[in-house]
A protein has these predicted regions:
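Short glycine/threonine-rich loop-to-helix capping motif typified by GTGT followed
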Residues: 52-60, 94-106, 135-149, 177-186
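A generic secondary-structure signal for well-formed alpha-helical elements
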Residues: 70, 115, 194-198
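Short beta-strand elements
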Residues: 154-159, 192
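Outer-membrane beta-barrel translocator/pore domains, especially the C-terminal barrels
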Residues: 114-116, 123, 141
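Conserved, mostly hydrophobic/aromatic
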Residues: 111, 162, 190
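Active-site or pore-adjacent capping/gating segments
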Residues: 165-207
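Catalytic alpha/beta active-site cores
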Residues: 1-94, 99, 118-121, 125-132, ...
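Anaerobic metallocofactor- and corrinoid-dependent redox/one-carbon enzyme cores
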Residues: 48, 133-138, 150-152, 168-171, ...
Length: 207
């Protein structure tokens, strides 16, 4: 189980895998001791999915990396409950509405089971995980880019129904250029309309 650590796609971090792995563990260990309210580790699986992996493969590789890091920290004698409550996961969100909801719900259950049964975490906060998501840039098309607003809306609604803590919507003109101020504003307003006008965020676990 060798961590990929952003070697999967567009990131160009030319460092030995073992060094990057150790550096990540050093950062988490330091933050767990000195920054008690800081989210010490974000597992970013976005580029796994954007590189062509399925939702299942995206989750699987993410859990491989999380497990590898936790084992390193436990090997140093660090208590799992000192850092586990502040692990976060950044997932991609594609256009498959119900699959993305299922992926996020499954991620929460698998994380809780892993922390409780595999790593013996006692603190109930260690059994939960903060999940954020960025909607798929690959879903944004260069043809008829205004239609991408609807794509971003559907992706965001699936994330709301899945119960993520934070959402970032890809800009509708992302396939054409560096996103404009207008497209950034549309992405922001899309979230605000879903939150404040649809009522979707007012219902706990609607599915």
């Amino acid at each position: 189980q060798v961590p990929l650590y952003q070697e999967d796609c567009s990131y160009r971090i030319h460092m030995p895998v073992n060094f990057r792995s150790r550096l990540s563990a050093d950062c988490v260990a330091y933050c767990a001791e000195t920054l008690p309210r800081f989210h010490v580790f974000l597992e970013d699986t976005y580029y796994f999915s954007e590189s062509g992996l399925t939702a299942i493969e995206e989750m699987a590789l993410g859990f491989v990396e999380i497990r590898h890091l936790i084992r390193q920290l436990l090997g140093r004698g660090i208590d799992v409950d000192s850092f586990a409550p502040r692990i976060a996961i950044l997932l991609n969100c594609s256009m498959d509405f119900f699959e993305e909801i299922a992926k996020i719900r499954a991620t929460r259950r698998l994380f809780a089971r892993m922390m409780r049964d595999e790593f013996g975490a006692k603190d109930p906060r260690s059994h939960s995980v903060v999940i954020t998501s960025h909607t798929s840039g690959l879903a944004m098309t260069a043809q008829q880019p205004v239609n991408n607003i609807m794509r971003g809306t559907l992706q965001s609604l699936s994330l709301v129904l899945a119960g993520v803590q934070a959402i970032e919507i890809s800009a509708f003109d992302e396939a054409l250029r560096t996103p404009s101020r207008e497209s950034h504003l549309v992405s922001l307003r899309t979230q605000q309309i879903i939150d404040l006008e649809s009522g979707a965020a007012q219902v706990a676990d609607p599915l």
